[in-house]
Amino acid sequence: MTPDIRVVIPARYASTRLPAKPLALIGGVPMIVRTAQQVAQAGFPYCVAYDDERIGDVLAAHHIPAIKTRFTHENGTQRLSEVVIARAWTDETIVVNVQGDEPLLPPDLITTVARTLIEHTQASVATLATVCDAPESPNTVKVVCDCAGYALYFSRSVMPYVRDAAAPPVSYLRHIGIYAYRVQLLKRYPQLAPTPLEQAEKLEQLRFLEHGFKIAVAQIDEAPPAGVDSPEDLARVQALFVHE
């Protein structure tokens, strides 16, 4: 039986680098609305998990499904955990996490990451990667996988490290930050303590690996357009909608 697939879009008002980021206008439309419109095209039930009534008011005005969550969450996965528990979704349900600052996300990636989790029955999480041309940058998260497509490790460092020039060529894989989770894991997430590697690399997904959960990784042909993390990113995306 094919599991239910749902999409949750976490939206936090108090962004450090870009205050009130979900409400930033892109072609006259709030960013969180743009992101929700992209997600809706995938055809799965979805909702925005927000933490501030200013976001909630905008979502209501645009008739976007939403659920109010606590503002104390440290990350988007905690927010997802609150949603799946509040909605009493079954353990077999698959939840795709799309960040609220991804107004250009191709909707087909939602289907791809969900299908990856369905096909990898040993995995509790699935995510995506693509070939990386600049592995030296610590802002680019790399992933290495086993022969079955499960993640071995994620890092900001260059990996794999090629020691000898005569070694066979390897492809560096850049992680794409979209995730699919089994609800069973999200329900357990509040009990999973932060881990040393997670804290060292500042990579939330390492918590799952360190606690023994498998992450399936599907390779896609090209990276999606970058999300909005800074005022410069916002200006870049706004320029694409300048004539709307």
Curated annotation (Swiss-Prot):
Put simply, this protein is called 3-deoxy-manno-octulosonate cytidylyltransferase
Instruction: Spell out the PANTHER family in the cross-references.
Output: 3-DEOXY-MANNO-OCTULOSONATE CYTIDYLYLTRANSFERASE, 3-DEOXY-MANNO-OCTULOSONATE CYTIDYLYLTRANSFERASE, MITOCHONDRIAL
List, alphabetically, the InterPro entries matched: Cytidylyl_trans, KdsB, Nucleotide-diphossugar_trans
Subcellular localization, per the record? Cytoplasm
One GO MF annotation is: 3-deoxy-manno-octulosonate cytidylyltransferase activity
| Cysteine pairings via disulfide bonds | none
Q: Known EC number(s)?
A: 2.7.7.38
Family note: Belongs to the KdsB family.
